[in-house]
Every structure is written in structure tokens, then in C-alpha cells.
Amino acid sequence: MSKGHSDHPSAGESWHLYKRIFGFIKPYWRLGVLAIVCMVLAAAGQAAFAWIIQPLVDGTFIEQDPGARLWVPATLVGIFLFHGVTTFASDYTVAWVGRRVVKDVRQAVFEQYLRLPTSYFDKNSPGTLLAKLTYNVNQISAAASKAVVVLVRDTFTVIFLLAYMTYLSGWLVMIVFGLGPLVAVVVTAANKRFRKLSRRMQASVGEYAQIAEDGIRGQAEVKIFGGQRYEAERFDRTNTRHHRQLMRYKAVQAASQPLAQLGAVIALAIILYLATMDVILETISPGGMISFIAAMLLMLPPLKRVIGVNAEIQKALAAGESVFEVLDAPPEPDHGQRPLERARGLIEFDRVAFRYPESEDWVLRDINLSIQPGETVALVGRSGSGKTTLASLLPRFYDPQRGEIRLDGHPLAEYRLQALRSQMSLVNQQVVLFNDSLANNIAYGLSERPTAAQLQAAARAANALEFIEELPEGFDTVIGENGVMLSGGQRQRIAIARALLKDAPILILDEATSALDSESEKRIQEALEKLMRGRTTLVIAHRLSTIEDADRIVVLDAGRVVETGTHRELLDHNGHYASLHRVQFNGPS
């Protein structure tokens, strides 16, 4: 368990989190100073309400001073206006800064997600990552807005009221301070509990968000396999756990405030009792006594908020820990400096071995493979043989633990990631499309927007132009989340068009035609054959009929290269490839 995850963080750790949270406020420090000034003035206006009571009682009702009858009401109106204006100014300014902080933190977290290695996403579910981006970041807003308002305005309100009460009767104020240790004990105990429960609540938000995402995204599978009851019960368990954590949090919050207020009420009761004693009546006027009691009553609500804000602060600090874990996570290693305009396409795997993080099983073992520029190499093998993993090492989604991969004679790590990946186009087995127009999906990632003719050429080559032109908006049609408005074959063809338009010298085709019907597949294969000329192409396919014309076929088994050759050579060899071929075309013997 990391240091930042201890249930009882030290004051130093909390202060470090405060500094990091308020570091996001630094760009807006001028507005922050303005807000603080307005909050202090609003606090002074609040204290002025207690002050005006003494001349109101003594001057207007007891002494019946004609002048007091004029200036006291006018001053009361002025105090109200002053307090209202300063309160509005502080609340609006703090809200603006707080929302800007949320925007900046959320942007920083999202950009960090884009920089993190693939292994990070293997270990963290999308629901958890989305919860950090939305729920946890919003909790930080409490420290940047509501907590600041309470800690500054309400704290200064208490200070000003205490100062005025001391001016009226220092002896009575000592009674109020006498019960201060009780309040401190309650607040300290509540702080530890708040932080612990806040972490648990935020973790449960990620859990039920993930379950909800699974149920919504996989709704077809849920329905066809009758999993509605199972998913509902799974969500109910997590939702109930979150509810319990929330109610425990609310119980601590509800108990801590009355206990702390009890001390203040006891002090008020003692003061009311002492107010009837002659020794007190000789030192303070009736208006002063009423003003003192009014000041104490006015002090209770801000005191309650100051005590209650600890819950928000601890919640924000717990959220801050979670968010800063993301921001502190090491990004993909990218230390290369070698320029790369356009690769020739010579790829070499030199004794490469790889296993996934936190796994002891080697997925790839001692891979030696050289792919010449412009050569089409197909990777085949049983499921789990390492085909897709081998291809994922080329764009450095992962780095091998042993051996070296070279492009044009230089190790991949010598190139900047952006330069390296700009040389590759990928059509993955799991097609990813964005909730945007077809044109933007096909042109995704290009530095310059392609012309309409270029878009049409790419779509035509991918056998997609015909169905695109039949859509009401054509290339401007928004296709929904992950292309939900398109069929599986259409989505695959859009992904191929995207790869065609990028025109990279290296192609990675992972099950690139697996979702196409026979006629479309034939036409796509023709287009891909034209595209692959002069380009280094790595094809991963389970269906051996799609790679019979490859320049070379590499057969993987248990993470090792066991055979290599052309389709005819491997059939004549009567080894692993021939066995796979017989299973696919003749059925198991």
C-alpha cells in the first residue's frame, strides 16, 4: 500500500495535497485575492449586524435618542447592502475559479490518459478511469470553492464576532473558549473517519460505473444470454455497498456537527445565566448584553459550517490522492531523438522475448524475424500463440523484456514515439470508430484535412464509397458511438479506408477482413493488394485463405517461430501450417 493511501495520513501529507490542489489555482491568483478580500469584507458586514444591535437597543429604546432613530435604521440598510454586494462578489468569483480549476484538472487528467502506456489500461477498468475523470475531479472542486468560502468568510466572521464580543466582555468570551478543546477533539476524530470513508466511496463509484458500462455496452449479449438478472444483482450489490459507505459518511458528518455545536450551546446557556447576575449587569449595558448574545447566535451558523467543511475537505483530499496518482503515473517511455521522415520498412526482431507486466508466463520466446522493405509477412498460429502480441511490439504499445526490435537498422527506442507511429497504419480486430462524421473518422489523426477527392478515393478503395453515398448526409453523417449506426462490415471498411488514407509505409492488418461478406472481402483484398505494393505489411489472420499470396508466412506456436515459408512450401513441409490448413479446410481428422 502506498504512502498516500494510509487511512490516517500525516499533516505533512495533507499539506502536500493542499499545495498540489491549490497549485491549479495559481494561474487565477488575482481573482483569488479579489475573492478573499470580498469574503473578509462580507465577514465584517456580518459582524456589523451584531454591532448595530447595541445602539439600536440602548440609543433607540432605552435612551430614546432622536438621532439614533435616524442613523441606526439607515446604517442597518447600508450594512445589509454592503454585506449582500460583497457576498455576491465573493461567491461568484470563487465559483468561477473553482469551475476553472475543475476544467483544468479534468483536462490534465484526460491528457495524461493519452500519454499513459497500454499496460496502465490493462490494469484499470474504463469505469474506474471515467469515475476519476468525472466524480473525483468534481470532489476536488469542493476544496477549491466551497471549502475556501467557508474557511475564509466564515472563519473571519467568527474572528470578527469574537473580537467584538471580547470588546464587550472579555470575561464572558473566556467561557466560550473554555469549551474549545471539546470541539477540537470532535473535529480531529471526524477528520480521520471522513478521509477513510471518502476513499471507500470513490472506489465504489468506479466499481458501479464499470458494471453499468459493461451492461450497457454489452446489452445485446446480456439479452441473448439471459443475463439481465445477473447484471441487475451485480449492480445492486455494488450500488448497495456505495450506499452503505455514503450513509456511514453522512452519519459521521451528522454526528460531528451537533457534538461540536453542543459545546457552543452550553457556553450560550452559561452566558444567559450569568447575564442575570448583578456583577455582570454592572459591566455591560442591556444593549451590549443583547448584542453579545446576538453575536454569539450569529457565530453558530458559520461555526457549524467551519466544522462541517472538514467533511468536504477530507473528501476532496481523498479525491486528490486518486487524481494525482493518475497525474504522477509514468507516461510511455519516449526518449528517442532520431529523426524519421519516411521509413524504408526494414523490420528486424532479434531474440525478442516478452511477457505482460505482473505475469510470469512468457508470451513470446526468442523471436528472430527479419521483414524486408515492401514484403508482406503473415503471422498465423493457434489462438494464444502470440501473433497479436508480436504485432503490438512494433508500434511500442509494449516493450520486450529481452532482445531488440529494429526499424531500418536502428532500435525502435531511438525514434520518438510520434515519429515511429506515424510510419504505421493499423486495422485492428476490434474496430474503433468515434462518435463523429464519417469524413472525420476516415481522416482521423491527419495533420492536414484531406480533400473531398482524397476521401472518396480512400473510401472507393476500401469498398465503402457506395454505402457512404447512400447515407442522407454522405461523408458528413455522424455514425454514433463506435459506429453503432453501421454494420460490422461497414465499420471494418471505414477502418480500412482510414488506413488507406494515412498512406504509411508500414501496415498492420489484424483480422482486417474478418467482418466482411464474401463479395466485399474479394473486392477489399484486391484493394489491399494494390495498397501493399511497396509497403511492409504484417498480416494477422486466422483464416488461412486470406494470406495464401503473402510473400512469407510465419507460424507461431506457444510464443515461438516454428515454421516460415510460402504457402506452398509450408504445405509441402507438412508441419504446423499444414495441420492448421487441414483443420480449416477439411475439418479435424
From Swiss-Prot:
Annotated signal peptide: none
One Gene Ontology cellular component annotation held by this UniProt entry: plasma membrane
Subcellular location: Cell inner membrane
InterPro entries in the record: AAA+_ATPase (IPR003593), ABC1_TM_dom (IPR011527), ABC1_TM_sf (IPR036640), ABC_transporter-like_ATP-bd (IPR003439), ABC_transporter-like_CS (IPR017871), ABC_transpr_lipidA (IPR011917), P-loop_NTPase (IPR027417), Type_1_exporter (IPR039421)
Binding site for ATP: G381, R382, S383, G384, S385, G386, K387, T388
EC numbers on record: 7.5.2.6
Alphabetical UniProt keywords: ATP-binding, Cell inner membrane, Cell membrane, Lipid transport, Membrane, Nucleotide-binding, Translocase, Transmembrane, Transmembrane helix, Transport
SMART domains, sorted: AAA
Location of the ABC transporter domain: 347-583
Record membrane topology: Multi-pass membrane protein
TM annotation in the entry: 33-53, 70-90, 148-168, 170-190, 262-282, 283-303
GO molecular function: ABC-type oligopeptide transporter activity; ATP binding; ATP hydrolysis activity; ATPase-coupled lipid transmembrane transporter activity
Entry note about domains: In MsbA the ATP-binding domain (NBD) and the transmembrane domain (TMD) are fused.
Assembly and interaction partners: Homodimer.
Protein name (database record): ATP-dependent lipid A-core flippase
Lineage: Bacteria, Pseudomonadati, Pseudomonadota, Gammaproteobacteria, Chromatiales
